[in-house]
């Protein structure tokens, strides 16, 4: 029996410990009592890990890349996964042959389930290790991304992942909770950039594998032939950090696909069969349709394409032994880790598990009925957040109770107090502040609402100005007069307004394209809505608005902070209302904000903090004419000494969960008991003459709570577009002349041919104007009918007035947009079809690694230019993902630094879809 010894860098994943760091090690094969084991000795020499190979190999995948280095992926049946990187070509080939022989040997003895692997100290064996055999390690090794293809061999992963289903006994999980220092201190696994990389050449020898170990031993001295052929079928895109899927048992797996795979003749998948050689590139692959599950595929592709979201799922070192099989975080992580290199059959299993887990909570997704993508997105985010809260609660309970069986990560260094960041809260959660101010007495109610997305209405404008995401946001944030029962003066007239108190990394905007007609039938609005490349939120923010959580931060967001209200801010709110103001605090019982203080201890405590002012101090302040300032100072001093308010559980936007409710126009504001209210009655503050126009004031009070409450659904029924703030008189006329001259210049220029390459620094005024030119020069939009528009009135050419309106909006985005409050388009989920009861969902996603846009249409993936995407989705765009500019540029820099010098992957050129192929049910 021969013994192989190779040197490389190894990364190990198991269910209980998660993914380790990539570390240098000596890998050796050893035979003991007719059993073959793999011994991994780390360079430190302190620890050795032993893995059973006999009758325990599920798949072996070998990949070669440039510079004669290779990597090998070994998946074991006992839910252990090994990624061996930076192997020499010769070592990788020999190790692959060795493992293939063991895998195909049918005369092996059954594997001992209790001998999965062990970790033990081996200080005495340190002398036996040849230190000169290790590679030299750089201080910061460059971890290369490599394409992961699935072999067509029936012995590979495509087969192995299903072996434990259908009544077969489950393998005993390996006892991975050990005292291995290399595992216990893995709080910072290899950074997972979750970028799709440029594909590399997959080289596989066409020589036959040796039929015995003796043949392999003889073959070690033979020179490998120079001729290689590709024999693979998979995706050239992958993740840096790789997790292996757990055993999919019968209770968790979906063994019968609901819909056959697309055939080559399917008009929804115009994918040509191209012969591959050693230099060819594999076409990207999306997700298979399980039967009307295009809504799920489109949403998941958009989520997985956000690098920060993928990092938070994969690289936190989550103790998987605390996560049940039916948890959404488990199934999503498996799908995210394997989607770029596993077979379509395995993708079906993983997608089926995601659907099954979500259906267990939301029964509406359990069958084969068509569902709404926004409903699925909301349920997915809500359920994932709940899983993370349960995980942190479980770990905290185990730590407080001194549970001996708790995860070893809880007892090593800073991990004992570690709180795992929720990917939903860190990436999508923002805070809106609602202000309700009585017009008669100035009594103000302030409410902070954490949300994961904004649902905005499609307003029918009387102006000929074209609709866009930007001006729809303007209408959403426009001040509105409402009937509201004031608790102080009993009047019913108030002014309501929303502003951002905390921004998110990614802003999700849901466009309500569905509503009820006069016959109370649900219909779709195919009206054209322009999709800007950039959004400016500066009009909806103030100086107290908090920026998104930085990428480098792992601290939980949403910590309760001291409420600080300045006299200037309060004056700005109430300046047009009354010259006599006084600060008080009490509960709210309005029709608009039904909150019961006796059922919410947190709210009562918050109100007590605001209202327990000293009567003596209050009287002195009234005599000195400074009641407002004194009350605020007194409140701040009391609040500093208080502990943080406990975080309360909350709900998603329940007003947007089903189709009939979700597309309601003009819905009323819904609040939950977790919402904190502050009522302010202001008095005796001089009124500034410049603050007479109430609609020009900004937000004023800032809260920051770690919870998700119900978002405002259809709060405004605006009748006109808000005019951007600006100077008057000559300055305004000059601005208009400049804008018109720019527009005229645009209309005289011809559109540039070809696909425009994305520039990482395209955030200046000049670049945005060029982007405007590219979009507005596409005057002939007749082809939009084939791309999803069923409204004949929307197929004509944009007139000059609409063109000028779009250009003015973009100019406003440039000149009014604060870089700290600007957002960049990264994904669009579209519904192709004229009816809410039929149609098809697709997603357009920006690839940070390739710096290009791709359309995901179930299994089909094709490249598309950003300009063409914006035009094609004018009538069908449904959910929009915008990323904060600072986060976008940082992720782009990381992607550029990690890119490999290889050619771009071959993809299907984006073309117009045939006829009504996209109108078929998902």
From Swiss-Prot:
Q: Which residues form a coiled coil?
A: none
Which Pfam families would you find in this protein's record? UCH, UCH_N
Q: What is this protein's record name?
A: Ubiquitin carboxyl-terminal hydrolase 29
- Function of the protein: Deubiquitinase involved in innate antiviral immunity by mediating 'Lys-48'-linked deubiquitination of CGAS, thereby promoting its stabilization.
Q: Does the keyword Transmembrane helix apply?
A: no
- Which InterPro entries does the record cross-reference, listed alphabetically? Papain-like_cys_pep_sf, Peptidase_C19, Peptidase_C19_UCH, USP37-like_PH, USP37-like_PH_sf, USP_CS, USP_dom
Q: Which CDD domains match?
A: Peptidase_C19, PH_USP37_like
Q: Which organism is it from?
A: Homo sapiens
Output one GO MF annotation: cysteine-type deubiquitinase activity
**Active-site residue list:** 294, 840
Q: Write out the ranges of the annotated region (Disordered).
A: 160-196
Subcellular locations according to the entry: Cytoplasm, Perinuclear region
Q: Which UniProt keywords apply?
A: Cytoplasm, Hydrolase, Immunity, Innate immunity, Protease, Thiol protease, Ubl conjugation pathway
Q: Which family does it belong to?
A: Belongs to the peptidase C19 family.
| Gene Ontology biological process terms in this record | defense response to virus; G1/S transition of mitotic cell cycle; innate immune response; positive regulation of type I interferon-mediated signaling pathway; protein K48-linked deubiquitination; protein stabilization; proteolysis; regulation of protein stability
């Amino acid at each position: 029996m021969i013994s192989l010894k190779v040197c490389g860098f190894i990364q190990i994943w198991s269910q209980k410990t998660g993914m380790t760091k990539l570390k240098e090690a000596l890998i050796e094969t050893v035979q003991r009592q007719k059993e073959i084991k793999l011994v991994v000795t780390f360079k430190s020499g302190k620890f050795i890990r032993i893995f059973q190979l006999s009758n325990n190999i599920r798949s072996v995948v070998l990949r070669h890349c440039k510079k004669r280095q290779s990597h090998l992926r070994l998946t074991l049946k006992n839910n252990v996964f090994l990624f061996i990187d930076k192997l020499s070509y010769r070592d990788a080939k020999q190790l692959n042959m060795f493992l293939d022989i063991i895998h195909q040997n049918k005369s092996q003895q059954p594997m001992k389930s209790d001998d999965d692997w062990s970790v033990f100290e081996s200080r005495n064996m340190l002398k036996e290790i040849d230190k000169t055999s290790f590679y030299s390690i750089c201080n910061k090794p460059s971890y290369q991304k490599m394409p992961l293809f699935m072999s067509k061999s029936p012995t590979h992963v495509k087969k192995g992942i299903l072996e434990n289903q259908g009544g077969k006994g489950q393998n005993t999980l390996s006892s991975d909770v050990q005292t291995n220092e290399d595992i216990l201190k893995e709080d910072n696994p290899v950074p997972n950039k979750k970028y799709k990389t440029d594909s590399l050449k997959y080289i596989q020898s066409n020589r036959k594998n040796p039929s015995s170990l003796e043949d392999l031993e003889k073959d070690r001295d033979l020179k490998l032939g120079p001729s290689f052929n590709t024999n693979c079928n998979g995706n050239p895109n992958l993740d840096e950090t790789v997790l292996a899927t757990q055993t999919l048992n019968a209770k968790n797996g979906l063994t019968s696909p609901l819909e056959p795979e697309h055939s080559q003749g399917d008009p929804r998948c115009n994918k040509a069969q191209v012969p591959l050689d050693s230099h060819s590139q594999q076409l990207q692959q999306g997700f298979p349709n399980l039967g009307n599950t295009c809504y799920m595929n489109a949403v998941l592709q958009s989520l997985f394409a956000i690098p920060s979201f993928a990092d938070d799922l994969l690289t936190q070192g989550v103790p998987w032994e605390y996560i049940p099989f039916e948890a959404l975080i488990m199934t999503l992580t498996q799908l995210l880790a394997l989607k770029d290199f596993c077979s379509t059959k395995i993708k079906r299993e993983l997608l089926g598990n995601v659907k099954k887990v979500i259906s267990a909570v939301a029964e509406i997704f359990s069958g084969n009925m068509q569902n709404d993508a926004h409903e699925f997105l909301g349920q997915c985010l809500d359920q994932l957040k709940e899983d993370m809260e349960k995980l942190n609660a479980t770990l905290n309970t185990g730590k407080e109770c001194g549970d001996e069986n708790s995860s070893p990560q809880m007892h090593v260094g800073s991990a004992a107090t570690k709180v795992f960041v929720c990917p939903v809260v860190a990436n999508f959660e923002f805070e809106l502040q609602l202000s309700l101010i009585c017009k008669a007495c100035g009594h103000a109610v302030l409410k902070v609402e954490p949300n994961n997305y904004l649902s905005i209405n499609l307003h029918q404008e009387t102006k000929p100005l074209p609709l866009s995401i930007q001006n729809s946001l303007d209408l959403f944030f426009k001040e509105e007069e409402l009937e509201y029962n004031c608790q102080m003066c009993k009047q019913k007239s108030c002014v309501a307004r929303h502003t951002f108190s905390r921004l998110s990394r990614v802003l999700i905007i849901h466009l309500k394209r569905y509503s009820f007609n006069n016959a109370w039938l649900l219909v779709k609005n195919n009206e054209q809505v322009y999709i800007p490349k950039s959004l400016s939120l500066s009009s909806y923010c103030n100086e107290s608005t908090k920026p998104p959580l930085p990428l480098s931060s792992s601290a939980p967001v949403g910590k309760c902070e001291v409420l600080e209200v300045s006299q200037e801010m309060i004056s700005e709110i109430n300046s047009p209302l009354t010259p006599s103001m006084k600060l008080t605090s009490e509960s709210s019982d309005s029709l608009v904000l039904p909150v019961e203080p006796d059922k919410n201890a947190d709210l009562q405590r918050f109100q007590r903090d605001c209202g327990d002012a000293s009567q003596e101090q209050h009287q002195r302040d009234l005599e000195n004419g400074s009641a407002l300032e004194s009350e605020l100072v007194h409140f701040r001093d009391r609040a500093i000494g208080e502990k943080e308010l406990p975080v309360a559980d909350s709900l998603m936007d329940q007003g947007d969960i089903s189709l009939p409710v979700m597309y309601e126009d003009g819905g009323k504001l819904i609040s939950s008991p977790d919402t904190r209210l502050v009522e302010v009655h202001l008095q005796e503050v001089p009124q500034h003459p410049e603050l007479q126009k109430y609609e020009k004031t900004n937000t004023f009070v800032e809260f920051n709570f770690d919870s998700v409450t119900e978002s405002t659904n259809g709060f405004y029924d605006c009748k006109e577009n808000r005019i951007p703030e600006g100077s008057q008189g000559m300055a305004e006329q000059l601005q208009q002349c400049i804008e018109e001259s720019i527009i005229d210049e645009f209309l005289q220029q011809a559109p540039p041919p070809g696909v425009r390459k994305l520039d990482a620094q395209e955030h200046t005024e000049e670049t945005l104007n060029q982007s405007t030119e590219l979009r507005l020069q596409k005057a002939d939009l007749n082809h939009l009918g084939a791309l999803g528009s069923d409204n004949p009135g929307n197929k004509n050419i944009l007139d000059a007035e609409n063109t000028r309106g779009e250009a003015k909006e973009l100019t406003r985005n440039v000149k009014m947009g604060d870089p700290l409050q600007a957002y960049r388009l990264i994904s669009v989920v579209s519904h192709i079809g004229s009816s809410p009861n039929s149609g098809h969902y697709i997603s357009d996603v920006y690839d940070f690694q390739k710096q290009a846009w791709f359309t995901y249409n179930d299994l089909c993936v094709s490249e598309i230019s950003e300009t063409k995407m914006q035009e094609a989705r004018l009538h069908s765009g449904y959910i929009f993902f915008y990323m904060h500019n600072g986060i976008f540029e940082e992720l782009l820099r990381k992607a550029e630094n990690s890119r490999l010098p290889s050619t771009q992957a071959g993809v299907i050129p984006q073309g117009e879809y045939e006829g009504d192929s996209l109108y078929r049910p998902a």
